[in-house]
Every structure is written in C-alpha cells, then in structure tokens.
Curated annotation (Swiss-Prot):
This is Aspartate--tRNA ligase. CDD domains: AspRS_core, EcAspRS_like_N. The keyword GTP-binding does not apply. ATP binds at R220, D221, E222, Q229, E477, G529, L530, D531, R532. It catalyses: tRNA(Asp) + L-aspartate + ATP = L-aspartyl-tRNA(Asp) + AMP + diphosphate. It holds the Pfam family GAD. Homodimer. GO terms for cellular component: cytoplasm. Its EC number is 6.1.1.12.
Length: 587
C-alpha cells in the first residue's frame, strides 16, 4: 500500500484516521500480551501497538518475529496514548496495528541505532549506512540541506549565476599537494583535481558573468585533522566591479540569512573587523575565538631588567592570566601544558600563582623587583594563574594562543550557544615557510596587494599587505577572500616575487596571463567552507559528523576500502608502474 505519511509526523490531529507507515523497527517490547514497537523513519519515531485480540494470528506471529532494523509496513488506526511521552513529537499518539508486512529482515547491527553510541570512528565509517540511520546524523544532514537551500535562494535573489567549473584541471605549484589523475590518452600527462575553482572563476569574470557562485567539491592532499577532509565542499563566490566592503556585505547577508532560516538566530550586522596584526598580538591566532577574554599581554619591555635571561634577552615575552584558576592547576597539570607549549616551538613554559597578594612559583623570585608593575599591567588578583612564554614573537603568539583555547575549554569558559563572527583584515601578502626556505602566498598568488605596499614586491616581501579578508566563527576560519589582480604586469611581478622564472610562470599560468590581455575587469570574491560552517551550526567538533560518506584520519574509507590497488592492466593502459613492497602490491 502507499505510505500515508512519515512516522515521525503523526500527531493528535490524525487521531481516528487509518494510515499506512513504512520504516525500521527500533525497539520491540512485550507487555501484558501486547506488543509495542518503535517504528523509525527519517522524521522520527512512532509507537505501534499490536493487540492479539484485534489482529489475526498471522499478524501476531509476524510481530513476534520482528527484530531490530527489520523493515516493515504497517496499517492501523491512530489513537491517543493513555500515557503521553513528552520526549517525542509523536508522544501523544500511537498506532493500533491491523496489518503488518515484513519488507526485509536484518542481521544484528554492529552498534545500536541510537544517539550517543560508543562505537569507534572506523566502525561507524565501515557501516556508515547504519550510522546515518541514527537521528542525530539524519538531523545533521538535513541541516546541511537547509543551509545549502538557504544559500542558493539568497544568491539567486542577488542575481548570482551558478556555473560549474571543471574537476579535471591543471596542476599548479602553490598551496597543498594536488590529487593527480593520469591521462590515458595523453600518456605521461596528469590532470589535477582542483583545490578550488580559483582561476576558472576569475576567468568567468573576464567572460562577463559579473556574479558567479557554485557549491563545489574541492580536493587537497594534506594531513588531516578534525575540521579537514581530502575532499570538501565550499560555497564559492566571485564578483566584478565590487569593493572589498561590498563583497563583505554580501557575505554577511548570506550568513545572516542562513542563521535565521536554519537556527532562528538574528545576527548583528555588520560583523566586527580586526586587523591581522591585532588578532595575532591579542589572541595568538589569525582566527581568534572572541567568546571569552584571556588576551595575550605583552611584557617584553616590563621584564627587560629582570635577572632572568630567559625573559630579559628574549625577543618577545607575553603572558596570559587565567583568572581565579590557581587552585585548578597543579604542578603536574602545568607540566602537561608545558609539553603542549613545546609542540608549538616554545622551549618551556614559565608560571606564577597569586597567593595572598604574593607571586608564588618557579620564576617568582626573579619578578620580585617588578611585582607591583606586573600586578598593575596584568590586573592581577588573588588566585590568578599567570603563564609566560619567552621566544620569538611567532612562537610566543602561537603557543599562548593554543594554550588560551585549551584552558578555556578545560575551565568551561566558552559559551557554546554563542556565534561570534568577525572579519580578519589587512593581511600580509606573504608568509615565510621554514620548510621551503622562502616566502609563500598567505592566501594565493592572485591576491591584489594594497596599493601603498605593492612597490615592496621587488623589496621587502614582509612589508607587502594584501586586500584580503577572512571570516572567522568561534575560533574557526569559516572562509576567506580577496580582491584579485587583473593587470598582467602586476601578476607577472607577483609570480617573480614568489620565485617563478618567466618561463615557469608562462608554463603554469600562461593562459591566465594571456586572458589579462583582453580587458580583465576588477574583481574579487570569497569562499566559505560549507562542511565547517554546518559543523559549527550543528554543534559538532568534527566535519565527519556533517558529511554523508567521509574519509577517516588516514584519508581512507573503511566501508569501500578506498583507496585500493588496481589491476596491472589498468596501470599499463596509463603507462604507470608501481614500486611494489609488502604493503603495496597490484592485483
């Protein structure tokens, strides 16, 4: 029979109606001769009642054979429950079953289909189709669908054009490693899966599209963590003839629309703006979490005269004050934080506690001469814990920024109901890479430099600033954008500053440089990480929880066993040969 409605949508208004439902058996209970079944579908749970006095012996026998995750079809009359269940939207009603059909049976599942399970991540991914039956996973993906629907409606209203760009593209050097796809037809040549549609969307501006968007899959072969995946989705925008502020206004409107339609939250516009240098100085991060205080305090000049060379001779000394937390952290706890500090390049972590108005701790004796000045500078009070790092400015900021976030989580200082958006602006154009031994693009090599600093492309690259902007939410980079270079000579200077020879630039980006000979308009845009945005809206800590079929931290899929070896014939067709070892053999 045709399904009347979803089980999770049956309400008191349906009492007395005969309906047909289809779904999965969640739980089965025998009470006083009656059989109670929780029927589950994507919209929720409905209680079924099977009374031996009101059904045939065949229906009763079928009901007694049911096990968890059997797929069934039931017909019956909606009735009011004697005792309502306030925890369920359907809790005021139940279905008195008159007909029951088993559509499919099921083996015992490797974990219960319910929220709050304790199965490990790889087991959940191995049986992802079962994991996705759980209500919280269904809700996460329904939220994701609502977010994308809201985004599309908003951008369509603003006359953005949805354009698909190629997945098989050209490998270019800047950024993370590419996923390469060998060409069978052009032997020895490779496509790259795009890390973003950056260049193609810029070319669409040259083609006169004016406003482009795409909700697009992107690929990066990089080390994974909780908010990264080898394939991810971004909301990609590009516009012509707009200023930085106009692009930001459009983005703020988009986020405000999504927040209102999916969370019922009215966000305050415009979002705050913070310069990159201020974010690093005060929060130790280019993606500051502004939901709590505990700002970094610069003490470099204050400690210059102390008889402690670690402080007095350090390029930079900063501290964070953990208010009233002296008793929360033992020496052993602080030793653990010291190990965290070392992960960020710090040689150690100095600390003092304020006890009865005095400084106590390993370095307190070196600070007696400046205790009053230090107390004033840090606004110290009894029971405060002070953590110091002395090193290069980069190490100091990174270390204290990481400790700041860790401590806030441990002490419950973060209001998880807050959504604090802000723009980080006035970025450096380049950042120094110790690994590469050269300057790299902080964003990408197509970013427009600020006019007053562009002359440093042939001078001190550290002084070049970009017309770039990142949007940050609760300590996560939600997205980033910039105005782009549209003048050929400036783009060539940018490539040269990054170490490209003329030949290399033409080989890698010649098509873009050629396009700049044909009236390339001023343009700029932005991309928002959809997975990360939905993760934060859903209150999750890992983007796997909002992606239907993600990879694990080894970039593998435990369900399909991808990536896998392939037949030797396939490799021969591609003119490829794999060096074999015990862990990597072709079939």
């Amino acid at each position: 029979m045709k399904r009347s409605m979803y089980a999770g949508r049956v309400r008191e208004e349906h009492i007395g109606q005969e309906i047909t439902l289809k779904g999965w058996v969640g739980r089965r209970r025998n009470l006083g001769g009656l059989i109670f079944i929780d029927l589950r579908d994507r919209e929720g749970i409905m209680q079924l009642v099977i009374n031996p006095e009101k059904v045939s012996a065949e229906v009763m026998a079928t009901a007694e054979s049911l096990r968890s995750e059997f797929v069934i079809e039931v017909t019956g009359q909606v009735a009011a429950r004697e005792q309502a269940n306030d925890k369920l939207p359907t809790g005021a009603v139940e279905l008195n079953v008159t007909a029951l059909i088993v559509l499919n049976t099921a083996k015992t599942t490797p974990f219960e289909i319910k929220d709050g399970i304790e199965a490990n991540d790889d087991t959940r991914l191995r049986y992802r189709y079962l994991d996705l039956r759980r209500p919280e996973m269904l809700e996460n993906l329904k939220l994701r669908a609502k977010v994308t629907h809201s985004i599309r409606n908003y951008l369509d209203e603003l006359e953005f054009i949805d354009v698909e760009t190629p997945f098989l593209s050209k490998s270019t050097p800047e950024g993370a490693r590419d996923y390469l796809v060998p060409s069978r037809v052009n032997k020895g040549h490779f496509y790259a899966l795009p890390q973003s549609p950056q260049i193609t969307k810029q070319l669409l501006m040259n083609a006169g599209f004016d406003r482009y968007y795409q909700i697009v899959k992107c690929f990066r072969d990089e080390d994974l963590r909780g908010d990264r995946q080898p394939e991810f989705t971004q909301v990609d925008l590009e516009t012509s003839f707009l200023t930085e502020k106009e692009i930001q206004d459009i983005t703020e409107g988009l986020i405000a629309r999504v927040m209102k339609e999916t969370k019922g939250i009215e966000v305050t516009l415009p979002f705050p703006r913070m310069k990159y240098d201020d974010a690093m100085a005060l929060y130790g991060s280019d993606k500051p979490d502004t939901r709590f205080d505990m700002l970094l305090q610069d003490l470099t000049e204050v400690v210059k005269g102390v008889d402690f060379k670690v402080f007095s001779e350090a390029p930079a000394v900063k501290a964070i004050v953990v208010k009233g937390a002296a008793d929360n952290y033992s020496r052993k706890d602080i030793d653990k934080m010291t190990e965290v500090a070392k992960q960020y390049g710090a040689k150690g972590l100095a600390w003092v506690k304020v006890v009865d108005g005095e400084l106590n701790g390993p370095v307190a004796k070196f600070l007696t001469g400046i205790q009053e000045e230090l107390t004033t500078a840090l606004a110290l009070e009894d029971k405060d814990l002070v953590l110091f790092v002395a090193d290069t400015l980069e190490v100091v900021n990174a270390t204290l920024g990481a400790l700041r976030g860790r401590i806030a989580k441990e002490l419950g200082l973060i209001d998880n109901d807050k959504f604090n958006f802000l723009w980080v602006v006035d970025w450096p154009m380049f950042e120094w890479s110790e690994e590469e031994g050269r300057y790299m693009s902080a964003h990408h090599p197509f970013t427009l430099p600020q006019e007053g600093t562009a002359h440093e492309l042939e001078g001190d690259l550290a002084k070049v600033r970009a017309i770039a902007y990142d949007i940050v939410l609760n300590g996560y980079e939600l997205g980033g954008g910039s105005l782009r270079i549209n003048q050929k000579d400036l783009q060539e200077r940018m490539f040269k500053a990054l170490g490209f020879s003329t030949e290399e630039a033409n080989d890698q980006f010649g098509f873009l440089l050629e396009a700049m000979d044909y009236g390339f308009p001023p343009h700029g845009g932005l991309a928002i990480g959809l997975d990360r945005f939905v993760m934060l809206l859903a209150g999750e800590e890992n983007i796997r929880e909002v992606i239907a079929f993600p990879k694990n931290n080894k970039a593998t899929d435990p369900m399909t066993q991808a990536p896998s070896t392939v037949a030797l014939k396939q490799l021969e067709e591609l003119s490829l040969q794999v060096e074999e070892d015990e862990t990597n053999k072709t079939n």
